[in-house]
Amino acid sequence: MTAKDIIFDSDARAKLKVGVDKLANAVKVTLGPAGRNVLIDKKFGAPTSTKDGVTVAKEIELADAVENMGAQMVREVASKTSDVAGDGTTTATVLAQAIYREGLKNVAAGARPIDLKRGIDRAVKEVVAELRNISRSISGKKEIAQVGTISANNDPEIGELIAEAMDKVGKDGVITVEEAKGMDTELKVVEGMQFDRGYLSPYFVTNPETMEAEIEDPLILIHDKKIGNMKELLPILEKSAQSGRPLLIIAEDIEGEALATLVVNKLRGTLKVCAVKAPGFGDRRKAMLEDIAILTGGTVISEEKGYKLENATLAYLGQAGRVNIDKDNTTIVEGKGTQEDIKARINEIKGQIDKSTSDYDTEKLQERLAKLSGGVAVLNIGASTEVEMKEKKARVEDALHATRAAVQEGIVVGGGVALIRAIKGLANAVADNEDQKTGIEIIRRALEEPLRQIVANTGTTDGAVVLEKVKAAEGDFGFNARTEQYENLVEAGVVDPTKVTRSALENAASVASILLTTEAAITDIKEEKSDMPAMPPGGMGGMGGMY
């Protein structure tokens, strides 16, 4: 086992503080509309330019082990806030640094760390309650655009695109961000349900120019097993041919005799038909087939449920207004399922999302939810260079997360003003002793720090003067760092999602409290590398002839 180095008390706390400050100082220059960019060296490829706090934090690794522990604890604040709310990582870092700095002063003066922590926890609880109290819900396209614009570092183009995407696919819709081939940033919306399976044979194509199969008003057969035998498929084929409507077959696979017969009949014109593989794998495939059945008003023909393909009737088949199929994707538009069934399925999936513990499962469930409830929007991000594109794509992803957070929990006034207004919630925080009261005061002081930093980053205005002016006012009045004017910030479009501000404070207080109650730090002792040259290979020379 490697030998360990242990440092205690003020020595440990001082070194941890150095690490906290190094990381926080690098991150906080990015805060606010006047925040600067940070350039990050990459071993492979071009350097990355970013104004995203968590991206900066994740790149920082310090040489001193104890300092690095302090830095990594604050990095955790940024990462957790990013995971939960998608934005507010720089605010969280600034708050964590301020809480730890103020707390250390009091620990050095003899305050009990555990009581400071209790005071901090009680203060945060009351501030969060006050934030929820002053929060307002958003619904309009304009408000959504404002949140997106602020989170994308005051880029109104991105804000408008996100608002338009949400307008098209709904608040639960899936919005994906991809790199565009050209320089233009644009929004593309896929209506209806799309899944990533194309036609099984190019002979099913109806439009040779686009190489797509376009089927109007089809019947849809949904089967969860492979179809290889024509005998079991024949009865339902005859029934659908008699109805005069085209048929789309979705099954685990269609092969051999069955596929060959479908192709021949399609080419002869006796049957309007197209076949595709079912999307997904395993249990997820079953769930997605059930989604398609509910959307189209059909039934999954599954032996598990007691249905056999040879006994299927037209009543089992789903229906849709239109289906478009290319070599990679199938899109079902205007499914004929009942709204009650679709709504019940949506609520069922929402329940599964709430219970899900896996990020991957949650993402897949949200995709299914979106496909049932509206469609999928794709934001194609264009830029003139790869460096700019990556930076812009990261900003769009941040803005998208923040906008979703705003829809969930509402918005508060931005520019650091919401935390100033939430200070009045501290009047409800109860302290059992002087040290707990000090913990509450630490939060009071820390809540001012984001506003101070936003002003400091403008480089032209005194933070103390702005702070006093904002504290003396009420409501949405604050300092707009972009225009350097005092005004109603909500009317000016300077807003933050409540979830972002709340998560930033809760995560910052949590990690800063752990650091404050730390009394010892244990690290590996670095082994001194020997300066002796290595022994030449081949053993002892000059001993030839000895036996």
UniProtKB/Swiss-Prot annotation:
Transmembrane segments: none annotated. GO terms for molecular function: ATP binding; ATP-dependent protein folding chaperone; isomerase activity; unfolded protein binding. GO terms for cellular component: cytoplasm. InterPro entries: Chaperonin_Cpn60_CS (IPR018370), Cpn60/GroEL (IPR001844), Cpn60/GroEL/TCP-1 (IPR002423), GroEL-like_apical_dom_sf (IPR027409), GROEL-like_equatorial_sf (IPR027413), TCP-1-like_intermed_sf (IPR027410). One of its GO terms (biological process) is protein refolding. Its main location: cytoplasm. It is an enzyme of class 5 (isomerase). It catalyses: ATP + H2O + a folded polypeptide = ADP + phosphate + an unfolded polypeptide. Together with its co-chaperonin GroES, plays an essential role in assisting protein folding. The GroEL-GroES system forms a nano-cage that allows encapsulation of the non-native substrate proteins and provides a physical environment optimized to promote and accelerate protein folding. Forms a cylinder of 14 subunits composed of two heptameric rings stacked back-to-back. Interacts with the co-chaperonin GroES. Belongs to the chaperonin (HSP60) family. This is Chaperonin GroEL. The gene is groEL.
